[in-house]
Amino acid sequence: MAGGCAYAALWPGSQLFGATLIAPARPGELALTFDDGPNPAWTPRLLEILAREDVHASFFLVGSKAETETSLVRQIAEAGHLIGNHSWSHRNLALAPARLIDEELRRTTETLEQIIGAPVRTFRPPFGARRPAVLRIARRLGLVPVLWNAMTSDWKIPSAEAIAERLARTIDRLQWRGRAANIVLHDGSHAEPAADRAPSVAAAEKLIARYKQSRRFVRVDAWG
């Protein structure tokens, strides 16, 4: 029983605790998503790459960081990228009481909407951790819970080539299975504000170069 609960709470593909948006049966589509920003050290470089390649992505932002980087948040939105809620403090919401879950999500949504002047309708739980209350509160606040199906530990892999190759293997496997790829990379860090995200940013550039001619890059809100 304990193992089943842990699977439901942490495995991104699990739907046991409630439906989440992962990726549809559209093998020609890829969604680049970035967590734990905004990060003034690395997000601007990422935005330059995306603009040059004419690719739109999805950014799941930590509210407490967004509050101090309002111009960067606006820059992300004005470039046509999706802004999503990644909680206020990046805590494990599966272990939090309902009152705190509501506060973390509500405060982040209100802050982001005030900054960009547009609705925020997607939410990615920190660590992918959730329980029924997390998903229920998110939906009550008008947020679609979004998980993923392509991730590697980019935050601890020092090589952009290794990150890109590991993700490419997953992407190709998903295409063979007839699925789109919902890819997670990190332009920030919840634990180390000064963490080097150069490998993750470079890996995103490599993935775009590899798949731009054969796949379509979309924002996750294209899927629901």
List each language-model region with its residue ranges.
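His/Asp/Glu-enriched short active-site or ligand-binding loop at hydrolase and phosphoryl-transfer sites
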Residues: 129, 135-176, 215-224
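A short acidic, helix-capping loop that chelates divalent metal ions and anchors anionic groups
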Residues: 91-96, 156, 191-194
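Active-site beta->alpha N-cap acidic-glycine motif
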Residues: 9-96, 100, 104, 109-116
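A cross-domain feature marking catalytic cores of carbohydrate-active enzymes
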Residues: 34, 61-63, 85-87, 125-127, ...
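Hydrophobic alpha-helical topogenic segments used for membrane insertion/localization
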Residues: 1-10
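Charged helix-capping and loop-helix junction motifs
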Residues: 74, 101-105, 160-167, 197-204
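C-terminal domain-boundary segment and adjacent tail
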Residues: 14-26, 52-54, 67, 194-224
